Structures are given as C-alpha cells and as structure tokens.
Amino acid sequence: MLKRLKEKSNDEIVQNTINKRINFIFGVIVFIFAVLVLRLGYLQIAQGSHYKQIIKNDENITVNESVPRGRILDRNGKVLVDNASKMAITYTRGRKTTQSEMLDTAEKLSKLIKMDTKKITERDKKDFWIQLHPKKAKAMMTKEQAMLADGSIKQDQYDKQLLSKIGKSQLDELSSKDLQVLAIFREMNAGTVLDPQMIKNEDVSEKEYAAVSQQLSKLPGVNTAMDWDRKYPYGDTLRGIFGDVSTPAEGIPKELTEHYLSKGYSRNDRVGKSYLEYQYEDVLRGKKKEMKYTTDKSGKVTSSEVLNPGARGQDLKLTIDIDLQKEVEALLDKQIKKLRSQGAKDMDNAMMVVQNPENGDILALAGKQINKSGKVTDYDIGTFTSQFAVGSSVKGGTLLAGYQNKAIKVGETMVDEPLHFQGGLTKRSYFNKNGHVSINDKQALMHSSNVYMFKTALKLAGDPYYSGMALPSDISSPAQKLRRGLNQVGLGVKTGIDLPNETRGQIEPLTNNPGNYLDLSIGQYDTYTPLQLSQYVSTIANDGYRIQPHIGLTIHESTNKDEVGPLKKKINGTVLNKVNNTEKEIKQIQEGFKMAFNEKDGTGYVSFKDTVVPTAGKTGTAEVFQNGEPRVNSTYIGYAPIDDPKLAFSIVYTNQPVPPPWLTGGDLGRDVINYYFKQLGKDDKNKDKDK
C-alpha cells in the first residue's frame, strides 16, 4: 500500500513538471505573437506611409540586350557566315542618372580598362573641358553672361562663343588620364536611356573583364557582356553578296533609320545594312534578351531579373553550292588574268551565273573585276546590279516575239544576204558577209544570223525587206511588241531575286530611230544583267516558264549546337509567267540552241562539243567602245542536260579586244558544266555506297 502511494506521488510530480514546461512554452509563444502584432501595427500605422513611398519610388524597367545573329549556310549545310564572340563592357543609362554621376562612373571605370582615344574629337575635348572646369569657363564669358541675361544673345549663340574661346592652351590641360575618362564618357553619352551601350568591345583583355566584373557593385549601369562579330570561314568568297551588319557604335545607319524604327528597333541596334544581311534581317536577327531592373528613387538598380534569356537569330540556308562557287571564281580569276596577259588591256569584267532552271535555285553567282594595274577583285553583286550589251544571245527571244505576233512561222526560210537600205546603210551577218544563203529559224540560231533577225523585226513592223527600201519611220509599236516578247523571257525586267538593288538594265526610248530598232533585235541596243540572261535561258530550258530566281533556300530554328535546327520555312521560286508561245515554237528555239552547241557550224561547237553531258545554248558578241577604241562583250548562255535540264548558266566578258584572244566564255562554260556533272556523279556514287 505504501509502495503504491509512493509511485502515485512520483507520477504526479512528473506530470506537474510537464505541465509547467508546456505552460512556459505557451507563454513564450503568446509573448512572441504579441510582439509581432505590435510590430506589424507599428509598421502599418506609424511607418506605413514611409514604406508606401519606398514602393512608389521603386521602378521596374525592362531592358533588351543584343544577341548574336543567325548563321548563313550553303545548300549542303557548310557554314558561310558565323559569329565570333568577344568580351565587352557595356553601360546602361538610368532614367534619372545625372551627368555628374555618369562622370563619376567613367572615372572609376577608367582605372580598370584602357580605351582607344583616337575617336575623340576636338569638340568632345572642349565639351569635356567645360564640364571639368565650369568656373574657368564662366570667367571667360563675363560679358556674354550679361548679354544672355538681358536677352541680347540666345543660349545657342552663347554656347558657340564659349566653344570658340576654348583654345589649345585649355585643351592641353587635359591629361592622358582625362582623355581615358573622356573616351568612356563620350560612349556613355552616345547611348539612349535604358539601352545598353558598348563602352569597349574591341581587344578587351581577360584582366580588364575580370576587374570590371569584380567591381560591378561600385559601377552603376556598367556590366560585362559577350558581344559578337561576323566571321567568314570562306574568306572573301561571296562577301559582297552577304552584305554588312552595323557596328554597336554605328547602330541603325542614318539612311535606314525610318525603315527600322518603324519596326520597333532601337537606334543603337545592330542591323543588316546591305544585301543578304538586309534582305533577311527578320530571319537573321535574334530574339533579344529581356532583363527587368528595379531601381530606387535615385535611379540606381537595386535588383535584376531575367525575363527572357533570348536566342540568336534563325539560320538561313542558301541555294549556293559553295564548292561550285569557289570553282567558278577560280576559273574566272585565272581567265581574266590570262586575257590581260595576252593584250586585253581594257578587259575589266568577267561574270557567271549558274542556276537550276526548274526551280530558280542560284547555285553560283560570281563576278571578277580587274583594274589597270592587273589587280583582281570580287564583283559578285555586279551579276545583278550592272548591265551590259550582250549581243546575239538574245536572238532566241527575238524569234519568240516574232512567233507571238505572227511575223514569222516555225521553220520559215529566209535568205541571209547583205541588206541594203535607202541612204547607203548596209547591214549583214558575220558568218555570211557577202553571199546569199537560205536558212530557217533553227539555222539562224546555229549560225547566229543577224539578217534573219533584221528581217523578222521588219516583218514585225509590217514592212518586209526589199533592197533599197527606206527603214520604217514609226517603230514605236513594233519596238513595244519586240520588247514585250523579250520581257516575257526575263530581258528588260527585274528577275525578282531575293536581293536588294537589282537593276532591270538600261532600256532607252526608240521612238524615231529605226536603225536602233534593228540593233535591238540582235542585242546591240538595250543592256541586260548576267542574272537576266540566266533567267532568260532558264525560261527556254524550262519550256517557257519564267521562274523567279532565289538565293535563300530554307530557314531553320536556331539551336545551341553546331548542327542545323528544325526546318521552319522553305523558300520556293515562283512562276512569274509563261511565254505567250506554243509548245512547238518553244521546241524550235530549243532545237536551235542545241544546234548552236552541237553542230559543226554552230557558234558554240568548239567549246561545247565534248561536254560530259549534252549542252544547248547560244553565243553572243556585242560591239562596244572603250576609250574610243572598238571592243566586244562576249556572252554565252546554256543549259544541260538537253533532255532534262538541271543546270543553266550565263557568262559575260566585257571590253575584250577585236577579235578576242580565244573563246574565254565558251571554255569557262564547258569547264563548269564538266565540273558540276562530274561532281554530281561522285555524289550519287557516294550516296549509293551509303545505302
């Protein structure tokens, strides 16, 4: 019994101890809760307005930061244009940042990086001297201050006079350290509010980059970043076609300001300025990185957050075969130098366009220029921005115009003979200067008969030829009909290529000059681009369908890896028109082109008789003058294989001697045809092995 009472007493003691501890803990909790309630009440009632003001003073700012552009690749995925990353120091000016605060930051930053001071102008130095020495500047303008106060002069006049008084002695006060600060300060001022501005992005050392990164908390608005430059793995090949991108310092070029600002760009954005970079800007530009900065009432950044990491631009794959392009360029370079060494002193341009006639894919677009000293430079853009007299290459278009207007019929025979007109004018063919030869339309193309074309043009004017006749007095209507026929195959109209600055050639009035009308029929009047010639021969090869040429092939999503991303869009060549001719008429021109390159009497036979695949085409020689001396432009157009054309080409050599040293254009066309189809055969064999 006593034992039980003792055990019960011990249990009560333990329970009392537990209860006391629980009560103590509850007491502490109640006390803490009471303190929190009191603190919350204090913050809400006593300090509420203070924190509301802090929130009110805070500002969330979204800033877009530049990202690299998309790559440009050839049709086989070889990278033609890429990005080379480089370290950079940037500055973003806040809404409320003062000039003195910027200057203070510039002074701190100047101790960490070394700037190039070559861009500093005298005006920059004068403005900076005024900012550093406001009292001295004021002392120089005592009289002018009074005049400014009483309205005798305006502020801009005052400023102008102040600048004029700052001379060499004042500017010499600026030390080398001052100039370092100024070099930074001027870049800071070049940017707009909330747009990151490049302070230094050339030759930033790892030491500078690390030093600035460590001091960012003491450098308001300054940041370290990665910038980029375009790099070209194939050197100068197609460099002109690629075009240029503006630098960070340049931003949007003045002449393109309205165009880009209307699309929501900032003035300091890097943009495509020319050719492919400009044409495909919407594709190649990246999605900017979006940063949200929170600033206090003084404009200082208190926190930052990445809203969108951004992405580099999409990749653009071209129709160009870079291996073919390099081969064409090498052949052009070799031939233009050889011509110069053989006495072609005025020879200045050699150009070639290679395309797929079925779909408009441009496979190669090459041009070379040679100056008086013999230096050869690339002139790829000249294939669509420069025009030349092309001679007899156009004769297929002349015959199509004749068929369209019922001036001649398929297979019609005419006599090639010297044509004698009233007033003593005589016109003749080169292959038959004095004889009388009966030829049909196909043979006219094979022999390149001028007379057949002249007689066709006269019939088109409703005035068939007879010896001693006067030339038609009014040729405006037939000239329009002839040009309309040439337009349908791509001569005298823009091709529609996806590149800016294309010319349609030089198309002069023909109202009252019948002699020029006849010259038009043989390619001796209007001028055309090599690209127009390529579209023209492609139209013949493609059974009369004129296809829009294009250099863009596909657009791909960007990835973080080297491989090409998923396909987003395919760029197709559209049918612009079909010539207004029958199938029989088009076949007749194709047969004539075939004969010109494959019959012994054909003008292109010597060069194209032994190509690895059968080739059809037309030659041309245009008479021109250079420095008062007679010269010729040599042209070749063609396609292969004859029965299923996969490649079409045009070649233009300008200002060659009379006669040219050798068949330069023909040799070039033959070599390119052989290279392409031999290479195609190798590729097909490799594909079979892989299966």
Where are these regions (language model features)?
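Short, basic/aromatic recognition patches
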Residues: 52-64, 324-344
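Solvent-exposed, polar/charged alpha-helical surfaces in well-ordered, non-transmembrane soluble domains
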Residues: 100-111, 210, 214, 239, ...
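Active/ligand-binding-proximal structured segments within catalytic/core domains
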Residues: 391-400
